[in-house]
Regions:
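Low-complexity, S/T/G/P-rich flexible repeat/linker segments used as non-globular hinges
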Residues: 163-182
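N-terminal pilin/flagellin-like segments and related low-complexity appendage regions
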Residues: 1-126, 132-168
């Protein structure tokens, strides 16, 4: 989904979980069926989850078992924190709308602007990560712009006490070209 303004996006990946040590697992490490269940398909869904008490942001996930039509055991409707110190997640989708056969993206758009998901050839993902612990000296206030999002001001990233949290931050991004597109 596309988060408006500087709100985070969410993204899901449908897949047959790989067999690791005789067990298929979801994004939280929970088993998905048995090794003999070659037909299981899940959607690992990722987004930002904020702890209501500490106000700490994390990358979270949960898994929908498409084959069984329910949340995978150990997962649930709420995102479960997976990686602490992730303040924001933004996603863009590379499409080729030139009508050619290059199979290379001609532009990147947000989820709301994808008219045909079979046209998506690549995914561009960016996260804003923080140092988890406060640093000294306090970092200079600045704006962070992740892909197409509105600027996210460091002064707006508050700690549990309601004050700016004095953490170092860095934007990381990558582009993933999808191999299973035709």
């Amino acid at each position: 989904t596309n988060g408006a303004g500087s709100n985070s996006d969410t993204i899901g990946f449908a897949m047959q979980p790989p067999l690791v040590d005789g067990v298929r697992r979801d994004c939280l490490g929970n088993p998905v069926g048995t090794a003999a269940d070659d037909d299981k398909v899940i959607i690992n869904h990722f987004g930002i989850v904020v702890d209501p008490v500490s106000n700490e942001a994390s990358l979270g996930c949960h898994a929908w078992n498409v084959t069984d039509g329910n949340w995978n055991p150990g997962s649930g409707i709420a995102l479960t924190p997976l990686i602490e110190g992730i303040d924001s997640l933004q996603v863009l989708y590379g499409i080729d709308d030139s009508g050619g056969t290059s199979r290379s993206p001609t532009r990147y758009v947000d989820a709301d602007s994808v008219s045909d998901w079979s046209d998506v050839l690549a995914i561009r993902i960016a996260v804003l990560a923080n140092s988890v612990n406060r640093v000294t000296p306090t970092p200079v206030d600045r704006n962070y712009v992740l892909l197409d999002s509105d600027p996210l001001a460091s002064a707006d990233l508050l700690g549990p006490d309601g004050n700016p949290d004095s953490r170092a931050r860095q934007i990381y991004s990558t582009t993933i070209h999808l191999k299973n597109t035709d």
